[in-house]
Design a protein with these regions (language model features):
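Alpha-helix boundary/capping detector
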Residues: 45, 79, 91-94, 117, ...
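Small/polar loops that bind or transfer phosphate-bearing groups
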Residues: 70, 90, 114
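Amphipathic alpha-helical segments enriched in hydrophobic/aromatic residues interleaved with Lys/Arg
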Residues: 101-134
Length: 134
């Protein structure tokens, strides 16, 4: 189980790049999601705690300050740590230029995780968007 808050955007205004949704979750120990595939990119940023992200047979241990990318139609699984469960935020996006944006972040199918040097700024932006859900 998790406590989560989500902003869902139903109609994209731009074809080249658009936000689909964003949110954050504070997970309970061993809370998991998947295996599941999604139609768009989703970037997760770990705000605190630890967990694992799995794509196929590859597992990525993650901790505070790191990010992981879910690619469109990729079957993934992720799970909070038993003793130090994570809290994370996510941003789902798509569009004709989304793949270029992902590459500009230094991510691709072979590099799905990274240290996130602008994590606090990303957190502020997502939380500001979530304040406008009511």
């Amino acid at each position: 189980m998790e406590d989560s808050y989500v902003l869902q955007l139903l109609k994209p205004k731009f074809k080249d790049f658009h936000l689909c949704f964003c949110g954050f979750a504070e997970c309970k120990p061993l809370h998991s999601y998947g295996p599941a595939a999604r139609p768009n990119y989703i970037l997760h940023y770990v705000m605190k705690g630890k967990g694992i992200y799995q794509v196929g047979e590859t597992k990525y241990p993650l901790k505070e300050g790191q990010a992981f990318l879910i690619e469109p139609e990729s079957l993934t699984f992720y799970q909070a740590d038993k003793t130090d469960p994570w809290s994370y935020l996510w941003v789902g996006f798509g569009g004709t230029e989304a793949q270029r944006f992902v590459r500009d972040l230094g991510l691709n199918s072979r590099q799905l995780t990274c240290e996130c040097e602008y994590g606090e700024e990303l957190k502020e932006i997502v939380f500001e968007m979530l304040r406008h859900t009511n």
